Amino acid sequence: MKIRAIIVLALIVCGIVSTIFYVKANQVSTNEKAIIEAIQTKNTPALIQALITRMKNQLEKDVNTFPELIKEVETYAGTCPDSASVAILHSMIAEMYNNYYMQNRWNVNQRTELAGYVPDDIREWTSNLFREKIKQELTLSLQPARLLQQTPISQYNLILKKGKDAPQLRPTLYDFLAFRAIDIQ
């Protein structure tokens, strides 16, 4: 009787695990479709949302892919035609560099600072390189200032988690990104 109970329990656990893997695999393919659709329809808020979802899913599988994900977002920022969305992507990139630095701070701070040379792989960077890159990305996230000041934050409701006072405190994209830059630094 105990053997049957163990076998039944093992089958149930296997069924649950396989269901979880199936759901995760389906989410990934759905997410890839969302990225392709957002690119085709030039819906940059949807593209940014799909990128965020894909990055979260990828990081759940393998934390070591973080540098590659940063490069991917940099590629999207370099090819995106919408200046306001490019500013958001630069803000995301700054946050990603900051998060990577914070997660690896102990190792990074043990290295001798580099001057005049920037390794391609951020796993080899020193603290001064991270600080400079984060500052550069935050500066880019606030440009073009005039356009960002005229862009209502409501255009990006899809990707924002706002509190009830957000429209009064940060009515434009520039306000939002400026507060975000302060938080990141």
Where are these regions (language model features)?
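N-terminal Sec-pathway targeting helices
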Residues: 1-11, 23
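Ser/Thr/Pro/Gly-rich low-complexity linker/stalk segments immediately outside membranes or between
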Residues: 24-29
